[in-house]
Every structure is written in structure tokens, then in C-alpha cells.
């Protein structure tokens, strides 16, 4: 390699490695100077002196440079240091959480004889809701009055999940008896049974645009069923533990599932395999909640709630969820409020965008119940987002609403202490 080609190589390497920098490291300058002749180095020195004399200053004493100041401090002063952490902190501080009105208990509904495990609100008229329980029954309640409308019997074990169709008069239920049942809400009878699951079914959901339902449970497999033919059209295997929750979307990823193997999987329904596996959680992931106003969702495990961007599964926010204990349920409304309920009976309300917990309540066990039976097992907001329904171990359903007339001055909420922890992977 001749001298000319060597010089071209050095210049190209300097441009690629240091072209974006406003200063060049001293060791690089020394190597460059060592290759220059005496006359060229003298000319460079004269040019630097001429530029220094052209700098105008109002100071009375000529600045001769810092002598005893460490080099890293000089770089910070000159703005040459890596300020990524500082920039991130300033970004966190600038994103102040939105104020939300506090919530209070307004109604307690009793009727089940076992733990209430699931709840779903009428997606059409927002006039009634259904609950499933350990007593193997499904009960339909009037949302305005809290009165029982009908009791559906057909399962022989715990009813773990319910979903209601917005296009057809059907309701689907999943149970520990290995069955998924389709209920005709006009006749209040079972019209279809979906057989084939090898163990208890923990979750069921209806596809928003296709005549398909998706179920998952203890056998660690997600199954896709054709409603009309009652046949299993697709089996999605990949989880290494029982699946706690499965949810459907009208676009990719059309299926999202979470499991006791501490993972969340985003499934490609056409390819029949996971698009993405989220492994950020360290423990059993118990529930998922989609944001109704943006394309993202939240997931929860013990002492850890995170939100994710779809489609790529990018981590958005680490919620301020320390010391929450086991989180059993999540729910999100249109106002950006994320609710979390767990085994300890604590009800936590978060600002979805910033992850700030603005209110903390504690549910009260019903008279005659044990203190350990005040845990929250399931929850959902109604279609307006103004009422929260919680299902609890004390066999009750509780309805929560905003405090009337609350303002930011009268109810400021819990203090906001921003940190970089919520953005950490």
C-alpha cells in the first residue's frame, strides 16, 4: 500500500468514526500531527493563533485555559459529555401526568355463592353485565339498578372468563370443566359446545371482525375455533406454562396472550406463529388490558406493570407499581386511567401515559367474610369509562364511580415523583 492510499484510508476512517463529532480526541490529533512535516505543523500552529486572536471578549483578564480542572469536567462544561440520562430525565419531568378525578365505591352487589372470577359488560347498549363464579353459574345483572336478571347454569366447574358478541346475540364462557360454551342470549340456553381442550380453560375472547373465538388455558396452547362449525381451525403452541389471558385484535397482531412462563406473545394468525415474544417480566403474567384510544396494551405480574406499543411490542412505560403484590386484573378506560387490583385488596389507579399512581384505595370484605377474602380477581370499565366493576373473593361485585364535583385543588391525588426507573428495561 503506497503513501497516497494510506492517507486516503486514514481520512476515510476518521470521517466514518469521528465525522459527527465537534471535537477530535487528543490521541487522534497526535497521530495526525506525527504524519505531518515540520513546515505543515508550523502553518497549523500559526492558523490556530490567528483564530484565537480574532475571538472578541469583554473580560479584563486574558483567559489562558484551565490548568487544574479535570478533563471530564471541561467536557461537561463545553457540552461535549454524554447527556442522554439528563435528557431522558428532563423528558420525564416535562411529561406531567394528567389529573384524573378520584374514585369511590357506590354500589355492592351480592348473589353469587363463590368467588366471582370474571365480568363482561354489554357491548351494545351498556345496559347489563354478566359475571362468572366458582359456583359454576353465570349471572346477568342490570347495570343501572344492580338487580339480577337471569342465572345461567350449564357448567359443572368454575367459570373463568366471559366474552359477549357485539354482532350476534351470543355470549361465550370458558370453564375449568374443559369446555367453551356458546349461549343464546335471546333464549338463555346453550347452543354450542366447543370440545377439544385437554385441561381447564382460563380465557376466551371473540375476534372483532371474524366469526372466530380464541381460547387458552392450563394446557399452554392457544386454540382458534370456528363459531359456525364448532371446529378447532388453528392451534398455537409456544408457551411453556398455563396461559392466563388471551385477547384478540382486528389487525396484526390479532392475538395476544400472557402466561405463567413470564412471557407475553404477539401471534400472527395467518402464519400461525408468534410475531414477538416479550420477556421483560420476571414472574407470572396474569392479565392484559388494551388501551381503547391508542394501539397499545398493558400487562401485569407481581409488583410490575408495563405498557407496550403495538405492533412491534416496544416497551413504553414502567408503571409506579412497587409493593403492589400479586396483580390479578387490569382495566383501562378512554380517559387514560389504568386500574389494577390484586390479592391484597388494594385498588390502584394510574395515569396510563406517565405510569403515575394518582389514587390508592382498599376494598372492604363483606360482613361474614374472612379478611383474606378481600382480594380483587377481575375488573372492567363500562362502555363509557365512567363506572368500574370489580369482582372479589368475598363473592361480591362492587361498582365504583368518580367523586362528584372533584377538582384538582380539592383532590390533588398522590404526589408525583418522576424518575428514570419507569423507562428502564
UniProtKB/Swiss-Prot annotation:
GO terms for cellular component: catalytic step 2 spliceosome; cytoplasm; post-mRNA release spliceosomal complex; Prp19 complex. Keywords: Cytoplasm, mRNA processing, mRNA splicing, Nucleus, Repeat, Spliceosome, WD repeat. This is Pre-mRNA-splicing factor PRP46. GO terms for biological process: mRNA cis splicing, via spliceosome; mRNA splicing, via spliceosome. It is found in: Cytoplasm; Nucleus. PANTHER family: PLEIOTROPIC REGULATOR 1, WD40 REPEAT PROTEINPRL1/PRL2-RELATED. It comes from the Eukaryota. It comes from Eremothecium gossypii (strain ATCC 10895 / CBS 109.51 / FGSC 9923 / NRRL Y-1056).
